[in-house]
Amino acid sequence: YMIDWLTNYGNNCWMSIFYNNHDNPRMVNKITEDKQYHEAIMKLLAVMQMTLKGTPFIFQGDEMGLTNYQFTSMDQVTDVEAKGYFKEYCESMSKKDAFKKILVGTREHTRVLLPWNEKLPSYHEGLVQEIRTEITDVYKTLIKLRHEDETFVYGEFDVLNKKKDRFVYKRSLEGKEYIMDCNLGKDVQKAYQADGFECIFTTGTDKDTLSAYEARVWKKK
């Protein structure tokens, strides 16, 4: 959707770039419930959000690496819509199964208060402060990069590789060029190679391959 708009309408449209809002569960959980990938996905989403054309909106908790809230009972859910669906689901399944189904899509996940208690399961086990800091640092770095170079704001947008599990695009303005290489899947992939470019930011470590959900930013020398 976003690629089609940016490609077909160019400077005639201005997108709002966001993943989360008060009416949906956290995007990272929509992509996968496998916690081992959550940190990488959060960083990947941040890279795309801060380098695509449009105005980025950071929803509360994105910058801290929050995931869906760990509700343990339907009594904790105040969302009227969720309660209505729960009652409907209970007519054809057990309350336990109905509750599981509600948790997948309820907007309650992004309406709870920010969990200041570091022991809450919204954070990764045993790495609360480290994980939160890493995600925050990624946002700080990318926001600084965006503020320092208007290429990320007003630059042209060109898709270099658009596959189901790979997204490579370029931003260019007045001779300046940046290439973003994004692995949208779990499989390790060969890194994008561009002559005359240097990698100025990466969410991974290996030089020749992209790890699961890794993203890199290349700058023209």
What are these regions (language model features)?
Residues 12-35:
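Active-site clefts of carbohydrate-active enzymes
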Residues 15, 23, 110, 153, ...:
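Glycine-rich, flexible loop/turn motifs
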Residues 2, 10, 33-178, 184-189:
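Loop/helix patches that line or flank the sugar-binding groove of alpha-linked glycan CAZymes
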Residues 187-203:
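Beta-strand-rich binding/interaction modules
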Residues 21, 184, 220:
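Residues immediately flanking
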Residues 184-185, 194-195, 213-216:
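Charged, E/D/K/R/S-rich low-complexity terminal regions of large eukaryotic assembly subunits
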Residues 206-221:
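C-terminal beta-strand-rich structural cap/linker in extracellular carbohydrate-active enzymes
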Residues 5:
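Short, basic/hydrophobic alpha-helical segments
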